[in-house]
C-alpha cells in the first residue's frame, strides 16, 4: 500500500506515504524516503507530488547525494566533455576545495538560495575577504551557478544560485570597486618609447626581445598571449599602405603551447591589428637579422617562426617557447620606474591594451565597430571593459564648461 495508517511506534496514528517506482533504464527500484503526515487527505496530496516528481524526471538518488561528491562528478564529466584547459580545471578544483569545506554533509536537495547566501557571507567573514566582480567569492558563485544549472529539472526546480549572485547576496556598500588599471598619458607613451629606443642594441638580440614586444603592444594593444604567439609571417603590409599584423593564434603560458586560435574565437579565425609605425617596422627588421644570426651561431631552428622567441634560455628557445609574460611585465615595470611611473593601480601589459583602447575611443571620427574589431572584441565589451576617460579630454571638457558651471 502506498498510504498506510500506522498502528504502533513513534508515528502511531499518522499516515505513512511510500512509493516504489522503478528506474526504466536500470530496472532497479528507486529509493524514495518515506514520509508521514497527520491526515489521509494530506497523505494523498504528498503521494501525488511524489509521483509527479518521478514522472517529471526528478532524480532522487542525485538529490540525496552530497554536494561535494556531485561537484567532483560534474568537474570530471564537463572537463572531459569540453576539453578544459589546465587553468580552467585548476580554477574549478579551487572551487571544489572551498565547496568541500563549507558544504560537507549537505545533500543536493537541501541546497537552496538561502543556504548559498549563508555560505557566501560566512566565507567572506571567515577569511576577511573583499567582495567585488573579480573577487574569489564571485568566481566561486559563478562556478556554483553553472554546476547547479546542470541539475535544474533533475534536482532543482530553479537554480539556487541566482544570476548576478554577488549583487543579490551583498549590498552595494558591502562591495569594493574593481581595481582600475593604469593607463598612460600621451607624454608617458612618448617617454616610454624613447626609453625603449635608447636601450635597444641590435648587436645583442637578447636585449631587444622584451623591449620590442612592449613597443609593439603600445602600438597595437594586443593581448599578451597574442603578442607571444606573433610570427614573422604575421607582419604584413607595404610602404605605401603601412604595416600591421595579421594574427590567428595565442600562446598559453600554463600549458606551454600555442592555442591554435585567438581568444574565444574558432580555429582558423583571424584579425588585423592596428597599423604600426615605419620606425617600429625598421626596428623589427633589424632585430630579425640579429635574431637569425644569433640562432645560426647557436644552431637553433626557429620552427614556429616566433618574433619574440625566448633567446635568454637555450632550452626554451630550442623548444620554441616565446618570452614569458612574467619577463615582459618585469621589463615594463623597470621601464616604468625609469620614466617615473608611480601608481597604486594595476600596472602590467594589459595597461598598454587599456591605453590603446582609451586613445582609440577618444580619437575624433573613430569607428567603434572598427576599433573593437582590431582589438578582438565586440563593441559592447570594448566600451564596457577597455574604455576609460582620457585625462586630456577630461581637462578640455572641464575647461569648456568653465569655472562658473554649465548654467
Report residues per predicted region.
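C-terminal catalytic core of Y-nucleophile DNA break-rejoin enzymes
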Residues: 259-286, 303-334
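Short, polar N-cap/turn motifs at the start of nucleic acid-interacting alpha helices
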Residues: 235-242, 365-385
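Catalytic-site neighborhood detector that most strongly recognizes the C-terminal catalytic loop/helix
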Residues: 183, 251, 375-399
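N-terminal DNA-binding recognition helix of tyrosine site-specific recombinases/integrases
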Residues: 4, 95-98, 109, 129-169, ...
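N-terminal DNA-binding module of tyrosine recombinases/phage integrases
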Residues: 11-16, 21-114, 118, 292-293, ...
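Basic, Lys/Arg- and aromatic-enriched nucleic-acid-binding interface segment
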Residues: 138, 164-224, 228, 240-241
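Short, basic (Lys/Arg/His-rich) helix/loop patches that form interaction surfaces
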Residues: 198-204, 293-303, 314-322, 326-373
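Conserved tyrosine-mediated DNA breakage-rejoining catalytic core shared by Y-recombinases
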Residues: 11, 18, 230-286
Amino acid at each position: 500500500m502506498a498510504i498506510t495508517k500506522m498502528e504502533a511506534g513513534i508515528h502511531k496514528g499518522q499516515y505513512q506515504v511510500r512509493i516504489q517506482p522503478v528506474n526504466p533504464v536500470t530496472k532497479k527500484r528507486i529509493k524514495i524516503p518515506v514520509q508521514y503526515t497527520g491526515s489521509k487527505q494530506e497523505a494523498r496530496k504528498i503521494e501525488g507530488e511524489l509521483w509527479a516528481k518521478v514522472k517529471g524526471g526528478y532524480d532522487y538518488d542525485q538529490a540525496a547525494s552530497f554536494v561535494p561528491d556531485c561537484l567532483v562528478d560534474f568537474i570530471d564529466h564537463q572537463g572531459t566533455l569540453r576539453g578544459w584547459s589546465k587553468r580552467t580545471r585548476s580554477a574549478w578544483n579551487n572551487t571544489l576545495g572551498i565547496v568541500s569545506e563549507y558544504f560537507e554533509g549537505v545533500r543536493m536537495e537541501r541546497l537552496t538560495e538561502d543556504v548559498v547566501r549563508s555560505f557566501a557571507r560566512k566565507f567572506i567573514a571567515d577569511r576577511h575577504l573583499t567582495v567585488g566582480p573579480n573577487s574569489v567569492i564571485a568566481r566561486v558563485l559563478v562556478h556554483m551557478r553553472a554546476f547547479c544549472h546542470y541539475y535544474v529539472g533533475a534536482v532543482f526546480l530553479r537554480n539556487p544560485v541566482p544570476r548576478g549572485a554577488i549583487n543579490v547576496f551583498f549590498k552595494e556598500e558591502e562591495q569594493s570597486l574593481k581595481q582600475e588599471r593604469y593607463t598612460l598619458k600621451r607624454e608617458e607613451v612618448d617617454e616610454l618609447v624613447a626609453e625603449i629606443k635608447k636601450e635597444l642594441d641590435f648587436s645583442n638580440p637578447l636585449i631587444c626581445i622584451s623591449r620590442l614586444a612592449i613597443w609593439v603592444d603600445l602600438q597595437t594593444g594586443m593581448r599578451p598571449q597574442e603578442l607571444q604567439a606573433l610570427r614573422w609571417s604575421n607582419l604584413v603590409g607595404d610602404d605605401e599602405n603601412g604595416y600591421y599584423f595579421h594574427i590567428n593564434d595565442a600562446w598559453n603560458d600554463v600549458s606551454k603551447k600555442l592555442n591554435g586560435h585567438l581568444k574565444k574565437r574558432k580555429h582558423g579565425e583571424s584579425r588585423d591589428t592596428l597599423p604600426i609605425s615605419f620606425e617600429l617596422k625598421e626596428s623589427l627588421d633589424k632585430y630579425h637579422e640579429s635574431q637569425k644570426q644569433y640562432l645560426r651561431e647557436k644552431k637553433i631552428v626557429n620552427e614556429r617562426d616566433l618574433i619574440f622567441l625566448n633567446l635568454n634560455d637555450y632550452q626554451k628557445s630550442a623548444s620554441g617557447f616565446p618570452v614569458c609574460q612574467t619577463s615582459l611585465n618585469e621589463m615594463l615595470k623597470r621601464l616604468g620606474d625609469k620614466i617615473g611611473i608611480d601608481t597604486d593601480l594595476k600596472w602590467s601589459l594589459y595597461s598598454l591594451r587599456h591605453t590603446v583602447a582609451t586613445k582609440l575611443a577618444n580619437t575624433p571620427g573613430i569607428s567603434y565597430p572598427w576599433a573593437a574589431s582590431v582589438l578582438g572584441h565586440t563593441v559592447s565589451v570594448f566600451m564596457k571593459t577597455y574604455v576609460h576617460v582620457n585625462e586630456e579630454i577630461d581637462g578640455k571638457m572641464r575647461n569648456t564648461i568653465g569655472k562658473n558651471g554649465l548654467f
